[in-house]
Amino acid sequence: MTPRLVTIPYSHYCEKARWALERGGVTFAEEMHAPLFSWRGALGSGGGRTVPVLVTEDGVVKESTDILRWVDAHGRPPEPYFPPDRPEVESLVSMFDRRLGPATRRVGYFHALRGDPAYVEELLTADVPAWEARAVRILGSVLPRIIRSGLKIDEAGVARSSTAIEAVFATVNERLADGRKTLTGDSFTAADLTFASLAGPVVMPPTYATRFGGAHRLPAPLVAIVDGMRATRAGAFAMRIYETYR
């Protein structure tokens, strides 16, 4: 059975899982859905209401970090994502999953969904089933409002999330201050992959930015944020990790 990855195309948690599978040499089929419809694909595959979900012959893997663990067990990554001699990888991944991912999603989506309506429609319909794309177009501006409401994407939330992003980036800046190549030393681990992928909405490495039509298509306020975050040590690190390992 070919594993099947259920995703929202531009989700950074889905990008994390996609990256791990591809780097791990796992052949898989990706089933992409628009927001609001992704839960049907997730539940229909035996997962919960969120994506990514990986469907395998061994069962259903419901979280992005658990997908990395599955790749360690069943794939062929050049180096293990969770090496047994690097216990700090676990704590870093947990921090990025809990604190960074929700914050960058809120900030990135806040600005992306306020872009030109034609751009927003293109973002929400790219690579999804035709019937979902038609439904998105029928819903028009209603769907972005539903997304903003469901994820609590508002001015106050963005302010809190911006503070959270700055705190996580400061932690990463400090770890990198000694000149290390990766967050835990010399080898690439789940910590590096998780940080780089979940920083994606505010750093926009070219590989990830294609999901948004390319960095040149981003709304101006988001471009300003991306430029500022790329100028930090942590932001430059995320870009380098993408360039080297993606």
Task: Name these PLM-found stretches.
Residues 1-133, 245:
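GST-like domain detector, emphasizing the conserved glutathione-binding G-site
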Residues 27-28, 35, 52, 140, ...:
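Hydrophobic/basic alpha-helical segments enriched in Actinobacteria
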Residues 46-50, 147-149, 174, 217-218:
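Short acidic (Asp/Glu) and glycine-rich catalytic loops that position anionic groups and cofactors
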Residues 64, 89-92, 101, 190-191, ...:
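Short runs of predominantly hydrophobic/aromatic residues within well-ordered alpha helices
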Residues 88-91, 95, 160-167, 171, ...:
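A non-catalytic, amphipathic alpha-helix used as a structural packing/dimerization or gating element
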Residues 100-213:
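GST-like fold's C-terminal all-alpha helical module
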Residues 197-245:
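Short His-centered aromatic/hydrophobic patch
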